[in-house]
Design a protein with these regions (language model features):
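Short glycine-rich substrate-engagement loop in P-loop NTPases that contacts/grips substrate
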Residues: 65-69, 103-142, 154-161
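Walker A/P-loop nucleotide-binding motif
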Residues: 79-99
Length: 236
């Protein structure tokens, strides 16, 4: 190459060098993606056991896993339409596992998800110099919030107020919520409940589609608009 009256020899990358450089760039990109995924999981999945709750680890014993799969596959619509899930059933039916599968799948797609429980949230709120409003705002900032084991938290006036505040804040922002609980649908709809519990459960049922995970549900499911949306997704 002639430059300013002088001849310069410019080396050209051979095909193997180009390929090696491309492979190195791809390797660095994969490593960066894995680093970001690890960071999202470290923040969003506080309990390490949640990390292993993935669709590929499902044993196929409960067909309700299909609902979780369809929810992930149609996440864009679920988020836009503010469709949440209320995964119900006795201990050991897989409802928390299903929620974890959804969380991990969306995290791997680059979405920000928080999976936690109200016991942990309330402990953070009562810690030294905790800013309750900031904690709630942080939970609202996630595109998807998953609350595991609703009903195990303490029932003090303060606790119930904060539980409602978290749920209502997401309701006002029209952001989806997934809840797992051992409570039955009849329990959550009971008129014998105190006002604090009634307004919490009423808000959840307004936001989430009830899905019974304990085998065949002998209770009559309500034909709500959101339930129909999820059923349509499953049946194609």
């Amino acid at each position: 190459v002639s430059l300013m009256g002088f001849e310069h020899v410019v080396s050209c990358l051979c095909e193997c060098e180009v390929k090696a450089r491309q492979e190195l760039d791809e390797k660095m990109q994969r490593e960066e993606e894995q680093r970001q995924l690890y960071q999202r999981k470290s923040v969003g999945l506080r309990e390490r056991r949640f990390w292993e709750w993935k669709f590929e680890n499902d044993n196929g014993s409960n067909q309700k896993i299909l609902i979780a799969r369809q929810y992930v596959e149609n996440w864009t619509d679920m988020k836009r339409k503010n469709v949440g899930l209320l995964l119900m059933g006795p201990v050991g039916t897989g409802k928390s596992f299903f929620a974890g599968c959804i969380a991990n799948a969306l995290l791997e797609q680059g979405e920000r998800v928080m999976m936690t429980n109200f016991s942990r949230i309330l402990n953070e709120m009562t810690s030294y110099q905790a800013d309750k409003n900031q904690i709630i705002q942080n939970l609202v900032d996630y595109p998807l919030l998953i609350i595991d084991d609703l009903g195990i938290e303490r029932n003090s006036e303060f606790a119930l107020e904060q539980v409602y505040n978290v749920i209502d804040s997401r309701y006002c922002k029209m952001l989806p919520l997934i809840v797992t609980t051992n409570l039955g649908l009849n329990e959550m709809k009971s008129t014998d409940l105190d006002t604090a519990h009634q307004r919490i459960y009423s808000r959840i049922l307004e936001m989430c589609v009830p899905i019974y995970c304990g085998g065949e549900d002998k209770r009559k499911e309500e034909g709500t608009e959101k339930l129909v949306q999820v059923q349509n997704l499953i049946t194609g």
